[in-house]
C-alpha cells in the first residue's frame, strides 16, 4: 500500500501548484487557452497583449473563475517593451519564473514573390526575435526558480510546406532555437521545447473557416478529418511544464491530427 507521502509526491508531478508563468499574447486564441490551462492547474500567470481593452475583458473573466492572473500591455515586436515586460514579471514574481510560453506571434501568408522587406522584418521580429530575446532576458529568472520550462509556440509550417515561406522560415528557426537552447541551458535546469499546431480554431485561422473549399482541403489533408481546438494545444503546453515532463527537452512536437506525417493515398 502506498504511503501518504508517496501519494503526495505522485500528485505534485502532475500539478503546477506554486509555479509562476509568463504567457505572451494571452488575450485570445491559443494564448488565452494556455493561460487558462496553466492557471487551472495551479500556476500564477502573468500575460500580455497589445490590445488593452481585450486584455482587461479577459482579466475580468479569469478573476471570475478564481484564476491568479496578472496582465500588462506589450507589443512583443518592440525590444524596449519586451524589456519592460520582463521587469514587470520579475517584480510580480519576486525575481523567479518557472514557465515561459513564447506564444505571441503573427502570420502573413502570400506567394514568396510578393513578400516585402517590411513583411519579412515584421514576421522575424514578432515570431523569432521576440522569442529569443524574451528567453534570453528570462534566463536569470528561470535559473533562479531552480526548475524552468520554456515552450515555443511554433507551427507545422516550420516543418512542412504550407504555402507561407517566410512565416514557415520564422517558425523553423524557432524550432532550431529551441533545440539549441535546450542543450545550452540544460545545466541550468531549464528545459526548452517547441509545440507545432496545425490548423486550430482561433481568430488567426478564421480566414480558413470562412472559405468552405479551403476548410475542406485542410480536413482532407488531416488524417483525423477535422481541425483542432485550442485546448488540444494548451494541454500539451501544460504537460511540458509539469514536473512529470522533467526529462523532456529539445523536442519539437506537432499537434496536428496527423497532417505533418500524411503522404498521399488514393481511395477509390
UniProtKB/Swiss-Prot annotation:
Disulfide cross-links: none
Residues at the catalytic site: 167 (proton acceptor)
Record SMART domains: PKS_KR
Entry superkingdom: Eukaryota
UniProt keyword terms in alphabetical order: NADP, Oxidoreductase
Enzyme class: oxidoreductase
Binding of NADP(+), residues: 22-46
SUPFAM superfamilies: NAD(P)-binding Rossmann-fold domains (SSF51735)
Annotated GO CC locations: peroxisome
GO molecular function: oxidoreductase activity
Pfam families, per database record: adh_short_C2
Role summary: Enantiospecific reductase active on cyclic monoterpenes and small flexible lipophilic carbonyls. No activity with tropinone, nitrogen-containing tropinone analogs, tropine or pseudotropine as substrate.
UniProt record similarity statement: Belongs to the short-chain dehydrogenases/reductases (SDR) family. SDR65C subfamily.
The name this protein goes by in its record: Tropinone reductase homolog At2g29150
Lineage per the UniProt record: Eukaryota, Viridiplantae, Streptophyta, Embryophyta, Tracheophyta
